[in-house]
Amino acid sequence: MAKQVVFDETARRALERGIDALANAVRVTLGPKGRNVVLEKKFGAPQIINDGVTIAKEIELENKLENTGAQLIKEVASKTNDVAGDGTTTACVLAQSLVKEGLKNVAAGSNPMNLKRGMEKTVRHLVAELEKVAKPVEGSQAIAQVAAVSAGNDDEIGEMIARAMETVGKEGVITVEESKSLTTELEVTEGMQFDRGYVSPYLVTDQERMEAVFDEPFLLITDKKISIITDLVPILEKVARAGRPLVIIAEDIEKEALATLVVNKLRGVLNVAAVKAPGFGDRRKAMLQDIAVLTDGEVISEDTGIKLENVTTDQLGKARKMTITKDNTTIVAEGNEAAVKARCAQIKQQIEETDSEYDREKLQERLAKLSGGVAVIKVGAATETELKDRKLRIEDAVNATKAAIAEGIVPGGGTALLHLAAGMGGFIDSLSGEEKIGARIIQKALEGPLRQIAENAGLEGSVIAEKVRNLEFNFGFNAMTNEYEDLVAAGIIDPVKVTRSALQNAASIAAMVLTTECIVVDKPEDDKTPAGAGGGGMPDFD
């Protein structure tokens, strides 16, 4: 296919237009008074949403050059979501501000490579400063505040997530699922999560979220390497007759067997997924046994004389729900409390008896996974549209809470970034030449999130930013009440991990845009549809 090649300022301005199109759609959702965005869906009702990364993923521009810019911002949102699970809108606003400020300086004659170096040094400096001012999250009240802010100032959700954290522990598993009722409830059940994902992306059930989600699945748990599909055929037929999904947890599944599973899954013959077993060596066997106890199944192993072709559905594990992503598998089990308690007691005994520090650590890890359970937040709402939006908000809140526990918190509402910008004078003086301009680009862009929060609340962003700049570090603008106050005391707080990821990802993409000198895209094809032929018959006469 023929390519379109665009250079210099034309290329950068095309990227900027694409960045603006996407960022302007996302930025209206920022802050407690942020608005919603309606997404048209090919099937079903439109989706009304307030989640930055979900909006970004939906946007595809007609102009190929501009679409390249939009895809770059999409990358910022997606990467921030992967790392921190929240802060995607802030990342988009920062990236847009950085690109705008940077392009002004490039157009004025600054060298893009020097600007890039200055920006990179400034981001490293700001990340170090964020770590210095971070406060650890202590107590369930602080956890509830972080969760409430991320869920759109919903105190009920904040308290529910704090209760979930108390129950399953800070490292525990919290899942969010849709409820059949109108109310949102918290339920704690047996379950575990391990760090292995699906072996093939073709096995996902939800293409948008790239997850395989199964209700009431059977689990085939084996320490064997499955290399030929004939070993599996008898049990696959039994499961298909039972009409339930099957999740295979095995040492490995080789190409031929996997290809057959994928083909049958795509044809709709089987609802199946496969996951590699967690751990290594003897520890793997022990972890498979843990999963078997949790799900009331058996480990299919040559050691116990059970062959794959002879397995019955009674020997399979049973779960209430399973969610498999590219990195993790979460099992929500049926009530099998007595067996789980007995297994936990056995592991505790091993912890007491072992002399090896390494073994003790690994046994404690297994005990935590098995005994911690899974907290399930069942989201209820009056309509499907509200349910989807509420579920996304709660997922953001869970991620933000975990991020806050990991790296601490800073004042929210864009305040921390603005105060850090105000204190950059000494650092900028330590830089040389055009690197100073790169630092000033970041300094100016750090105002972006606070300005946008104020504008979404119907106020003049620059006036609010100027007032906040002269306040103490913890003090800022509360857009919910339109008051200037101590934001940490008021519970308006952001996780450092979210703020840091947003800044790093935005600066990375902005530096790439500024140093772009050429874009190559597919040339739009001309419409080759032949013109309609003239109608036959007699000509018209006056």
Curated annotation (Swiss-Prot):
One of its GO terms (biological process) is response to heat. It is an enzyme of class 5 (isomerase). It comes from the Bacteria. Gene3D superfamilies: GroEL (3.50.7.10), GroEL-like equatorial domain (1.10.560.10), TCP-1-like chaperonin intermediate domain (3.30.260.10). CDD domains: GroEL (cd03344). It is found in: Cytoplasm. Its EC number is 5.6.1.7. ATP binds at residues 29-32, 86-90, 413, 494. Pfam families: Cpn60_TCP1. It catalyses: ATP + H2O + a folded polypeptide = ADP + phosphate + an unfolded polypeptide. Coiled coil: none annotated. The keyword Cytoplasm applies. InterPro entries: Cpn60/GroEL, Cpn60/GroEL/TCP-1, GroEL-like_apical_dom_sf, GROEL-like_equatorial_sf, TCP-1-like_intermed_sf. GO terms for molecular function: ATP binding; ATP-dependent protein folding chaperone; isomerase activity; unfolded protein binding. GO terms for cellular component: GroEL-GroES complex. Disulfide bonds: none annotated. Keywords: ATP-binding, Chaperone, Cytoplasm, Isomerase, Nucleotide-binding. Together with its co-chaperonin GroES, plays an essential role in assisting protein folding. The GroEL-GroES system forms a nano-cage that allows encapsulation of the non-native substrate proteins and provides a physical environment optimized to promote and accelerate protein folding. PANTHER family: 60 KDA HEAT SHOCK PROTEIN, MITOCHONDRIAL. Forms a cylinder of 14 subunits composed of two heptameric rings stacked back-to-back. Interacts with the co-chaperonin GroES. Belongs to the chaperonin (HSP60) family. This is Chaperonin GroEL 1. The lineage of its organism: Bacteria, Bacillati, Cyanobacteriota, Cyanophyceae, Gloeobacterales.
